[in-house]
Amino acid sequence: YKTQIVQAPQMTMTSHLAKENQAEAAINGSYFNVKTGAPTTFIRLDGIVRGETTRAEAFRTDGAISTDKNKIKIHAFDSITSKKLGKKYKNILAAGPLLLKNGVRQMAPTFPENTGKATKGNAHSSDVPQGFFKRHPRAFIGITPDNQIMMVVVDGRFKKHSVGMSIDELSYLAKQLGMRDALNLDGGGSSTLWNN
């Protein structure tokens, strides 16, 4: 299958975007401005930068997914690697947190009680909202050791049905599913998985 990153010119449903691009399967991507639909994380499509990571998203944007010659890769991504990776790959989308890299669970920021400050992990800011790491609906993409792509959505916010997962639980799930690399995508109400 051909694997690609696509961006709608305006806010649209994952299913509509998938159908427009004749996709067999699709998952929502990274974070965006809910008023304008503009991306709030780095995205480069067909060699053109379409968005940069905003300061508000930097705390959780420590990974990226690229497509090149129908291959997908998941990378560690920060302000230093963004320029290098952004030039190397014509199609790349930043997101996060990074859940797995080479089979190793990545450490999410932790919060000592009553401090409200992140002290460990991949935090880029001490202003990480604690709520981000609570259980929520989640979406993530991963690659197995034999280069199979897995797209996963975890439902949430329904007490009797599903409460969602924390970032730590999500990285554990990615490991249990046999992924080598995995990247969290925009979750919450954006969590969408579609197949034809």
Give the location of each predicted region:
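Structural recognition of the beta-strand scaffold that forms the well-ordered cores
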Residues: 24-28, 63-66, 73-74, 140-142, ...
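Solvent-exposed loop/turn segments at secondary-structure junctions
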Residues: 30-35, 81, 147, 156-159, ...
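Short gly/pro-enriched beta-turn/loop segments at secondary-structure junctions
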Residues: 60, 69, 91-94, 99, ...
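Zymogen propeptides
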Residues: 1-76
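Short acidic-glycine loop/turn motifs at beta-strand connectors
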Residues: 35, 66-73, 77, 101-103, ...
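Domain-core and long-helix interface of multi-subunit machines
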Residues: 103-105, 110-111, 116-176
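Extracytoplasmic/secreted cell-surface and envelope-processing proteins
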Residues: 34-39, 75-76, 83-85, 108-109, ...
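Charged catalytic cores and adjacent phosphate/nucleic-acid-binding surfaces used
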Residues: 171-196
